[in-house]
Amino acid sequence: MKIVIDGNIGSGKTTQLGLLEQKGWTVRREPIDKWPLKEFYADPTRWAFLLHMIILRTLRPLKTTKPVIYERSLLSSRWVFWPVLKRQGHVTDVEHDTYDHFYEQFSWSPDIYIFLSKDLDLAWEHIQARGQAGDEGVTREYLGELDAEYKKLIKSVPCLVFMVNANQTVEKIHQDICKILVENELLFRDAHGSQVQKSSSRGREVPCTPFPHVCNLS
């Protein structure tokens, strides 16, 4: 079971992944320590193709039938970040064709896609305040271009898609994500054969995942 939490830069993915990890979920973060982000932002034409080839090899799903929450997926690499780079002239036609060839080999689709939708101004403020590695190369204009591509992507993601208002408080965003996970527990049972637990609060049966805290629907 592959659950992806996606969103523009500065949408709050890292914070939410941390909260879910604290509750017992297996979380797979973007391995940005393996990516030449600093070099890319300094010279995107030189590093765009290499960066995205590295992403293809490192942003891979775990070999498990248990639910895993992933920070982004190759979908955003191919259909959000890559189109912006191509439009800006940072990749050649040969690089584009080569990348597409390998993308077809390494691509994978999530079972559930949760998108954190955050206003650009708020995302920009968050980026400036947090000082995360690689943020120094992000501009407000670039953020806007990514936002436009994300709006196209979420219309064609090949799985269940859920939009979460990321302009809310951290706590409310977390509640909304947990609600999505609880309401889709039937998919988790199909993935790893979980037992079924009675729910007295709603008078129906729900599958109990390996994480007891998400079995409580009260």
Language model features by range: what are they?
Residues N8:
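P-loop (Walker A) phosphate-binding loop of NTP-binding proteins
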Residues E21-P61:
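Conserved substrate/cofactor phosphate-moiety recognition/catalytic segment
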Residues K13:
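Conserved lysine of the Walker
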Residues Q16:
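Hydrophobic positions on the alpha1 helix immediately C-terminal to the Walker A/P-loop
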Residues W124-S200, C208-F211, C215-S218:
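NTP-dependent small-molecule kinase module
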Residues W47-S107:
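Glycine-rich phosphate-binding loop used to anchor ATP phosphates in small-molecule kinases
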Residues I5:
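Hydrophobic anchor at the beta1->P-loop junction of P-loop NTPases
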Residues V80-E149:
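A glycine- and Lys/Arg-enriched "phosphate-lid" helix/loop adjacent to the NTP-binding pocket
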